[in-house]
Design a protein with these regions (language model features):
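Short N-terminal targeting/anchoring amphipathic segment
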Residues: 1-11, 23-31
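Membrane-proximal helix-turn-helix segments that form the acceptor-binding/catalytic region
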Residues: 10-13, 17-21, 34-36, 49-79
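Acidic anion/phosphate-binding donor-loop and adjacent secondary structure
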Residues: 40, 91, 104-118
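Acidic donor-binding loop of glycosyltransferase active sites
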Residues: 77, 198-217
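Carbohydrate-associated surface elements
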Residues: 85, 103
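Conserved donor-binding/catalytic core segment of Leloir-type glycosyltransferases
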Residues: 113-135, 139-142, 297
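Nucleotide-activated donor-binding/catalytic signature segment of Leloir-type glycosyltransferases, i.e.
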Residues: 153-155, 162, 167-196
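A charged, aromatic-enriched C-terminal amphipathic alpha-helix characteristic of glycosyltransferases
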Residues: 258-262, 275, 279-308
């Protein structure tokens, strides 16, 4: 069979052509779709023309992306995607749409206990816009911890492993809060070093925003499941109040905070535990987390192709 896993649509017609030519089943796997974004973040940059012309070009580009993608989806034997919301969205074009979560490699991501000299909240990833990923609940909670003299910068750090564009967004969002002295910025690190970075952290940060028709929808990133796998407390701000929050709750891996008060209480609890023990820990539902391993993903795809090839 043919498996085409693509965000952009240009490989889809090629996969469709090969599948038809050689009479092979076609499985289309979409890890991202245009509709999940709050705005036009799926476009790497604007077209740097007049604003009205930019809008027109963007509308035309979006229309073509969706038209070509949906035509290919209708002809696929099976579609796979990453969240319940994505499944519901894509079933409109192909009823044979199945959920295959993003996941983690269990040979790389597993719990290690390290005593650390600092309490570290860690974020690894990218920010495209505050509409999609908004850290301000975190800043509000940390501001209160600082104001009430519950933390100090020598022991409490927020470490960002991000690119320059993400750093600019974070710094701009933080200007209204007295948190700059708690923050460190690092360049991206090699993938092989990520498990160690996560395991030496005290809280692992996921950034999101509330699910809305004009906001982000269905984001379930690989980094979410890698964070769950190492067994560190996971803090998501701001909760999507949807499938991301439900997954964090069902795995008992942390908190998807809807308010700054919730984030404040969560951070303080784990900070006080760290002060007593030198490390943090959370009792995740290991069986629930293991459902998201790459091994389970591979088994799902094997079942799909076995079923399609037996027709």
């Amino acid at each position: 069979g043919i498996l085409c896993s693509s965000y952009r649509t240009f490989p889809l017609p090629a996969a469709q052509y090969i599948a038809e030519k050689y009479h092979l089943p076609l499985v289309i796997d979409l890890r991202d779709i245009v509709e999940q974004y709050a705005s036009n973040e799926y476009i790497a940059h604007n077209f740097r023309t007049f604003s009205w012309l930019d809008r027109k070009i963007t509308e035309t580009f979006r229309h073509k992306l969706l038209r070509d993608r949906n035509n290919a989806l209708r002809k696929a034997d099976q579609v796979t995607t990453i969240s319940p919301w994505h499944v519901e969205k894509l079933q409109a074009y192909n009823p044979n749409t199945e959920l295959v979560y993003n996941g983690y490699d269990p040979e790389l991501f597993y719990p290690e206990q390290h005593r650390t000299s600092q309490f570290v909240i860690t974020y690894t990833g990218r920010l495209i816009s505050l509409a999609t990923r908004d850290p301000r609940l975190l800043f509000e909670a940390v501001s209160r911890l600082d104001r009430e003299k519950l933390i100090d910068p020598d022991q409490f750090r927020i470490q960002w492993y991000v690119d320059a564009g993400s750093k600019a967004i974070i710094m701009q969002a933080a200007t209204a809060y007295p948190v700059a002295r708690y923050m460190d910025f690092f360049d991206y690190v090699p993938a092989s070093e990520i498990p160690g970075v996560l395991n030496r952290s005290s809280i692992l940060l996921q950034l999101a925003n509330t699910f809305a028709s004009d906001g982000p929808k269905g984001f379930m990133t690989t980094k979410l499941f890698e964070s769950m796998a190492v067994g560190k407390p996971l803090l998501c701000v701001k909760s999507d109040e949807s499938c991301l929050e439900a997954t964090i709750r069902n795995t008992r891996s942390g908190l998807a905070a809807r308010t700054a008060e919730e984030a404040f209480r969560f951070i303080l609890h784990h900070y006080q535990f760290w002060q007593d023990n030198g490390y943090t820990h959370i009792n995740t539902d290991k069986e629930a987390v293991e459902r998201f391993s790459r091994k389970k993903q591979a088994e799902q795809f094997m079942r799909i192709f076995t079923r399609l090839n037996s027709k």
